[in-house]
Amino acid sequence: MTSFRHPGTVLTDRFFAVPLDHQRPDGEQIEVFAREVVAAGQADADLPWLLFLQGGPGFGAQRPVGREAWLNRALKDYRVLLLDQRGTGRSSPANRKTLARLGEQLGAQAQADYLTHFRADSIVLDAELIRRELTGDPWSVLGQSFGGMCAVTYLSFAPHGIREAFITGGLPALTATADDIYRRTYRTVAAKNAAHYERYPQDVDQARLVADYLDGHEVRLPDGAPLTVPAFQSAGGVLGGADGSHALHYLLEDPFAGEELSDSFLYAMMNQLSFARGPLYALLHEPSYAQGCATRWAAQRIRAEFAEFDPAVSGLDGVQGVEGSAPLYFTGEMIYPWMIDADPVLRPFRKAADILAERDDWPPLYDPARLAANDVPAAAAVYYHDMYVDREFSMQTARAIRGLQTWVTSEYEHDGLRVSDGAVLDRLIGMVRGNI
């Protein structure tokens, strides 16, 4: 356990041993890392704990410097624990290097079986072991995006461990399949494309120029991954953030150096497309929705139902660029099989990814009956235009969780917790406490 100071905070690094498979508590153990953050001058105070569950899946918690964003509001009332969910950050990593030997010795099936232990149900059981080690009392839980899904899993299977729950952009569909979810999200992504091109009509021509170039040339990113038209389309994953449309515009405003794509553009695309920071995001994205059925590469299959995402088809009826270009529709956070083939950090998992996609015995992630009887104070922010978590599914879930209060807002996008300077968290705290 190591402690150090940042401006206005004291941070303590903690490691916890947890079983890889919670059904076999005496079996293989892995390590989970968490960072405690407390306001300077409050290190010895008797403050309630707030567990932060990061969005993802597959990303470690934020690395704070000072008291930025929502953390400043949280530190007024809580001792915060930033959890690197299993397999991420400084927790025992699950990536191509750590799982290479497993694949070499036992094959892709063993890799796939190993990866089944990195979903929300296992994360919640990790959290319970950590809670019992740190404090005997229930703690508060803040879940952002995928972390909100974990929070609902927590309310389903270990509500005794939660004092109060705050969920931001992360109320999951309780019974919908991955197919159902992608049918909703493709429509939302299409609307985000339309809004982007209305804001930046010049980008119609720019995007089409890049797509036409890629259609006629073999292009490699700095990490060796191929940049194809579908890969370029996946740059639309940023459109769900507050500044996402502007970020996409800046990417498109100067992509060429003479007659070739510029190094700076290719580097920017690599940063957007590479899963080096979070390989589990790609491998477990669709399995994170699965309950009792196979996902079978749902995003790829359902995409065929939406012709506007075909690069050969105009996305907007009657809308053209300045030079007569047909709009190219960008995709969202969907994961496609070609991504596993293309990305060097994912390629070793190609067979394992297919095995995960065909697995049909996934255990439940939520307990509707338990949620209907919920007695944990809880509040959720539902973002009206959320591109990543469907609003209608979120509201169905909100109605299914007894006592859950919701705040539906168009003031923020999916990243409202991060960009609101504490306002989103402050409102949810006020709702739970009866002040709003």
PLM regions: where:
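Gly/Pro-rich cap/lid or specificity-loop segments adjacent to the active site
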Residues: T2-I30, R35-G224, W338, D343-D354, ...
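Charged, amphipathic alpha-helical interaction segments
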Residues: A39, R399-R402
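Core-facing hydrophobic residues within beta-strands of well-ordered domains
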Residues: I162, I401-L404
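Alpha/beta-hydrolase fold active-site neighborhood
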Residues: E218-R359
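Short alpha-helix in the alpha/beta-hydrolase fold that links the catalytic acid
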Residues: L251-E253, D390-R399
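Short beta-strand/loop motif that positions the catalytic acidic residue
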Residues: N374-D375, A379-V382
